[in-house]
């Protein structure tokens, strides 16, 4: 995926870099961790990779990482014809405990699942939750647990969130496609107290999809 001769799916290199960065960044942020170091590995020469490296720095800053803590490597020894991106994020959980949902929590899908090639995944799509929004949600102290949605879909991630807490999810009717791939984590699933749903909704853009998909209860 990218603009190079050997790529099978054409895409803007800067947007490729953004999507390549956002997935691991969201995993770290949603785990309640503070990302500290951003490491990229690119399978092309440094000159052609520079726009992607610049985007990595922008993503790092959006996630709370200093631009000086962005490092990585390019391939300048041999000629390559395809885009290849690797990203590693190192972070720390301040209190050492992973977040966990609570009995009675409301489960919300923030954003909506979209994925190429079925969808045109472009920067202006309102379905895509932003790094800034995820930071604000997690910094609120009112999100009990949160998981990015990948190729398994919303329902699968919601089940992972509930089972990790030893709970079960009671689903409710929603227009959200619960089985569709979330591609590059265009949306996320979070758990919070019912009284905090409205306040948390105010931390994301008004056009961002926000849907209650169920609630959590004890396993009988």
Functional labels for PLM-detected ranges:
Residues 73-74, 132, 175-177:
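A generic local structural motif
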Residues 84-89, 97-140, 144-162:
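Conserved mixed alpha/beta catalytic, RNA-binding, or beta-rich assembly cores of soluble enzyme
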